[in-house]
């Protein structure tokens, strides 16, 4: 037997098959937890190829497992290794379980996918549950349309796992805005495990953004596509608005995203080079700093982007994607009903005049703070309190805490 580990430990599994959202959310949660408890260490397991591009606080570290990408048709493929996908998935599952056995976490948090990618955390959950380790599932505010999510979860046999393998379910949002499990046959025993934490606030990065990332002296609009893997239509739409010669109130800073195809990035950079009031970068790990200095935002409306809009109280136009999931559309629609953002639907035609009008209206639309919603950004406070209760709780009983907004 090796030497016993010291201090409190939390292990986080970050689902990583597409984009940046899961990693950025897990990183933000890890930082909030260690900032609140000097005796706590957090280890993140992820297959993201760019996890090393992010800064991590003291007592937060990561293990990168072999990467797997989920294609738009729903199939999986490896990111770089020329190994059979099934072999990669088996390797990932083995690394995850061995890490949990060695790290001996006091709490295990799973992000978004209850059983992990293709069930890769099921054995780890079963092992830790048998050891008495609290297991927590973290869900974003919206998953997908019930008509799509229900058969997916039935196929994956998720509902029994929620009952048998998890002690608690955190929903990173407010019930009055979105219920991620609405329309699903969720038993009362699972509903009792759910805690709505409120959204996760974001703060300016401690590291400064590169000076050449913000070339404008005047206020600018930040345009971001998240990871960028499917953001080309939004970037094209915005660029056409600036190429039209119409008068627009502010210049635009485009963040294309690290997963946008290289050929597409090159084409966009060529178009940007011909415009005086548009600048483009591929990626900046300090996106919070760029947003904090912006007058407003145009984005696709992923979870992290929405949290940033609320946190920095920025006017925003959301252009949600509707494939392969309706998640962004559902979030943007609900937020627009409350006046937190405005939404511009992608009708497939993407008329230039529609984007011109949206950019002109952006500086005068209401700010998110003008909509008063108790508990809206209480996410980290709720998570910290729940975590502390679990770490202090030796009886195995579920700690009770008022849900954000109640």
What residue ranges belong to the model's regions?
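Conserved nucleotide-sugar phosphate-binding/catalytic loop shared by glycosyltransferases and other
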Residues: 6-9, 14, 32-87, 91-93
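A short, glycine/small-residue-rich beta-strand->loop->alpha-helix junction that serves as a flexible
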Residues: 14-27, 50-51, 231-232
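Donor-nucleotide binding loops and adjacent catalytic segments primarily
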Residues: 30, 184, 199-296, 348
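Short N-terminal targeting/anchoring amphipathic segment
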Residues: 96-118
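A nucleotide-sugar donor-handling region in carbohydrate enzymes
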Residues: 139-233, 259-262
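A donor-sugar binding/catalytic signature common to diverse glycosyltransferases
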Residues: 286-330
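C-terminal amphipathic helix plus adjacent low-complexity
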Residues: 354-406
